[in-house]
Design a protein with these regions (language model features):
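Charge-dense, helix-prone N-terminal extensions
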Residues: 1-174
Length: 174
């Protein structure tokens, strides 16, 4: 569910008290562990943590007008989500995203808590479902400079079918 809120504070005020408490708990952990090169703000109707254009002028390859997204925090219809773009995909290759996804799954398993995870999102119903210290460590492990390097490497790596062309290059070709 995308919010129409224009600020993080407005977004938080729009949530029911139980969800506000859960989102705030996760937000506090993120902010405590976030590399100072990232910024917090509203992005795609969610609380976003991103690399601003002042640090990475190219922006998000899918929409260069947007800053490069790193993480998102959202209240959805049936659950809340933490999107960690640094674990997107999480395949078996040796990409930074795959390595970070493997680390996250292995570390999570050691906590004894159930992991409800999609390609890049961790779904939860309450903050107690999450090992908050692990969330903090996951955020801390990916400073903006290394995230940018991983994104650049992923965008320059050809796909198996040889058609790896970034959205930026496709847009320029039009």
């Amino acid at each position: 569910m995308q919010s129409k809120a224009s600020t993080v504070q407005a977004y938080l005020r729009s949530l029911p008290a139980d969800r506000r408490a859960a989102i705030s708990a996760v937000r506090d952990v993120i902010l405590k562990n976030l590399d100072p090169s990232y910024e917090e703000g509203m992005q795609y109707g969610m609380i976003g943590y991103y690399v601003p254009h002042s640090v990475y002028p190219k922006g998000y390859h899918c929409d260069p007008k947007q800053p490069l997204p790193f993480a998102m925090l959202a209240s959805q219809k049936n659950y809340m989500s933490l999107y960690l773009m640094c674990v997107y995909g999480g395949g078996d290759d040796e990409s930074a995203g795959s390595k970070h996804a493997r680390w996250l799954r292995e570390a999570w398993a050691k906590t004894g808590k159930k992991l409800d995870m999609g390609k890049s999102c961790i779904r939860f119903k309450k903050a107690e479902d999450l090992p908050l210290e692990l969330i903090g460590e996951a955020v801390k492990r990916v400073p903006a400079a290394s995230y940018i390097r991983a994104i650049e490497a992923a965008l320059s790596t050809p796909r198996a079918n040889g058609t790896r062309q970034s959205a930026r290059n496709k847009a320029a070709a039009r």
